[in-house]
Amino acid sequence: MARVGACLLACLMSAGAFAASGQQLYGTCAACHGARAEGNPGLGAPALAGQHVAYLQRQLLNFRSGLRGSHKDDTYGAQMRAGSQATLPDEKAIAAVATYIAALPRTEVKPAGKFDARNGNNLYQGKCGACHGGQAEGNEALSAPRLAGLDAAYIKRQHRNFGKGLRGAQPQDRYGRQMALMATTLASERDLDDVIGHIHAAGAAR
């Protein structure tokens, strides 16, 4: 019995150290992404709080390896690539900071300005919802990130990056390549605005 208790205590101490490590590592990220990972559109930094752990880990690994952020025209991606390489030395560090971020309270964004709710809903459900969820909550089983909570400028920038080959162009980036194909199906700026409005409205309604 004493041995079981000692093992349990050791596990709890290990979990506590892991969480503390994630929080400490996030300190560098907070300068751009905010103290609670709420994001900062003025710096081009998206909200990260409440995002799926596996997605966060994959993107950080992609930045470190150059699958993301290596295109000469991807300025913000290059910043993230340099930052992740400088502050996250290995996969254990990436797992710790991703776990910490995912546990933070989610950020919601209210729709800004007018948008065609019907068109946004129809387009989102027809093109995005099957993977990203009916309310933009994401789907870990499909490796599709949560979109609710991401600011409009970030979503537009990533849509453009996928469409122009700045992201998702490398053969090894399986999920990025899927999104690069999907980005071509939403070509109109008005349609994109309507979809983003729907994403924000759906996220706020949850």
Regions found by a protein language model. Give the residues of each.
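An amphipathic alpha-helix signature
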Residues: V53, Q57-S65, I94-A98, A102, ...
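Bacterial N-terminal signal peptides
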Residues: G5-G16
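Sequence/structural segment immediately N-terminal to covalent heme-attachment motifs in c-type
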Residues: F18-E38, A112-E137
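The feature marks the first
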Residues: G22, G27-S65
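Intrinsic disorder/low-complexity detector
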Residues: A98-N122, R206
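Disulfide-stabilized extracellular ectodomain repeats and their linkers
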Residues: Y26-C29, A45, V53, G77, ...
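Axial heme c-ligation environment in periplasmic c-type cytochrome domains
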Residues: N40-A47, R64-I94, K110-F115, E140-R146, ...
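A charged, solvent-exposed segment within the mature domains of Sec-exported extracytoplasmic proteins
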Residues: N119-A169, L181
